[in-house]
Each structure stands twice: as structure tokens, then as C-alpha cells.
Amino acid sequence: MNQVLTETRPIRLKGRSFLAMVLSPELPLDGWLERLDDLARRSSGFFLGRPVVLDMENLAIERAQLVYLLQALNDRGVWIMGVEGARPSLLGPGMPPAMRGGQPAADFEAPAGEPQANPGAPEPQISQAVRAPGHAVHAMPSMVITEPVRSGQSVYFPEGDVTIVGSVASGAEVVAGGSIHIYGTLRGRALAGTAGNTSARIFCRKLEAELVAIDGLYKTAEDLEPRFRGQAVQLWLDGDYMMIDTLS
């Protein structure tokens, strides 16, 4: 009887890095969840399809509270791919795995409360918010997109600047480690300086944005002065302030 021998093909395992958002909950959890709801309300679909890591490093809670938090996030459509900094006793079957070795980048924070703007204040418009510190990155490469970014599409380029020759539709997103240049209307979301670049800027021919962010400082449509909507503008950071001015 003949025996046919076949060579077993090995399973290929590869290491690969991916960009994920890190959420850092604070006590009391219900108050933090309310602020998260506010961010989601201000920018619809912000967490849709986005991988998220839960940072437990400075959060002293019990397992029952963690189960409650994970369920609350799941109910809000926030998918937790892993948990960082949690005690081993907190995690178990059916829960996200422990994550280690994450490399820091610009932090993601919900917009902070701010005072009402003075109608008589001179331009450029300044709005105060809290910004997490990052490490400046220089001499970045660039990416050029020669067509519009349609609703539901995302452009990720954490290595440097992104230029869009066209518009960014509502529900679309552009994420860049450096600056973002949009030669059209910005209706979706633009997140610049995500590699910790405090000198990053956002430029667009027409501002109708759902959300803009530079180095972790976020502003939603409700936070932006109405007089800048529909205008050609640039946005940048000056310390802990996001500044906006029209382009001549």
C-alpha cells in the first residue's frame, strides 16, 4: 500500500503595529461616561469602527466595575480591543486581553468646558482647552490624495502631512501625524499632529467641519465660531489654545 506524504505548511505569524485610540477612564465612571456621550453627540460616528485600548494604569476599580465599564462602552458602540495597565486579577474569560508595550503618541481627550467668547474680541479667534503634552516630530514625509474623501472613508497617515486635492465629506475622516491641507470643503473630521506634533496645522478652502483636532486638542462644530463657517481658514496651536484665522 502506497502512502502519500505531503509537506505540512507552517502557519505564518507576523508582528505588525496598528494605530489605536487609548481611552483613559476616570472616577466616577458615570460622570466620565457622560462626558464620553457628549463627545459622541458632538461628533456622530467618532468611535464607529475605531479600535480602542482601555488604559487602566491609574484607575483603582474592582472587577465588577470593569465589567460594568466594558458593557457601558459596548452599549455605546465603542469596541475595546485590549486593556492596558490592569491587574491580572481584573481580567478573565470573555474580557479583552491585556496589552503591553504601547508606544505613546498624542493623547485623545474630549473638548474641555470653556467660557463664552467675547463678540468684540479681535481675530484670530482663540478658544481655550486642555491639551495633553506630546513630543514634537520634524521633517515628516507627506501624502497627496488627488480625489475627494467620501462619506465613510478614512485617510490615515501618522508619518507626516496629508494633502487632499478635493473635499472631505461629512462622515469622512483624515488623520495625519503632521499638517492637513484640504483644497476643498472640510465637512468631516480632520485630526492633525497625532504623532505629537504641536506645530501641525489644518488648512481648508471652506470650513464646515464636524470636528477638528491638533495634537489631542479637539473642537467640534458646536465649539467653532459661526463666523468662520464657510470660510477659508487655518487652525493651529499656541500653547494650550487652538487658534483659527481666515486665509487671505
UniProtKB/Swiss-Prot annotation:
Q: Which UniProt keywords apply?
A: Cell cycle, Cell division, Septation
Q: Which regions span the lipid bilayer? A: none
Q: Which GO terms describe its biological process?
A: cell morphogenesis; division septum assembly; regulation of cell septum assembly
The cross-references to InterPro entries, in alphabetical order and at most eight, read:
CAP/MinC_C, MinC, MinC_C_sf, Septum_form_inhib_MinC_C
Entry's Pfam families? MinC_C (PF03775)
Locate the region Disordered. 94-125
Reading the lineage from the top rank, the first entry is Bacteria
What is annotated about its quaternary structure and interactions?
Answer: Interacts with MinD and FtsZ.
The family this protein is said to belong to: Belongs to the MinC family.
Q: What does this protein do?
A: Cell division inhibitor that blocks the formation of polar Z ring septums. Rapidly oscillates between the poles of the cell to destabilize FtsZ filaments that have formed before they mature into polar Z rings. Prevents FtsZ polymerization.
Q: What is this protein called?
A: Probable septum site-determining protein MinC
Originating species: Brucella abortus (strain S19)
